[in-house]
Amino acid sequence: AQALKGIIDACYFKPTIVNVVDSVKVVNPIMYKSFGYRALYHDMSAGLNNVTALSQIEYLIKFHFEWNYNRPDLVHDRNMKKHESIMERSLKKGGRRDVFLGVREFIGDVEYIDEYRFTTCRTAYDGSSIDFGYMFHHFNYPNNNQKKFKSIFAKVKMESGIINFDLDGVEYIEN
């Protein structure tokens, strides 16, 4: 969920809001490809890098935003229609900043979809269930109420291509 939140934050981020990922739909089959490329270093020498990366990636991300209550100084900016409109315009234009899928060499594209497309889009995993076990879910950053930085790992299951990120009723570990 943290990586998907990074994609959404690249499209529109303000300290007034916190983007929350609800679910992701994995449209294409999960496939990998390996390849090598020559990297040019800052001292103008070159090296060979070998990479294994996901290929043919297509995710549909369902999310919402909430007010950042850790910033009471921004209460005057809590206008739901304003932020919804800016987010929608940003998504329709492909986001505000480049989206990276892991590292800078893997740039992603963003486009706006509506609820109808999210629910009707077929996936390679329709009718199947895959248990991924425990996976990294998100970070809990220190704030006024919590003093420690925590990593959250949750038991992740994909049902018909959809992974839900709501932790209610889901087994998770805090580290």
Task: Give the positions of each predicted feature.
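Internal, well-folded beta-alpha domain core
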Residues: 37-175
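Long, hydrophobic N-terminal alpha-helical segment
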Residues: 1-41
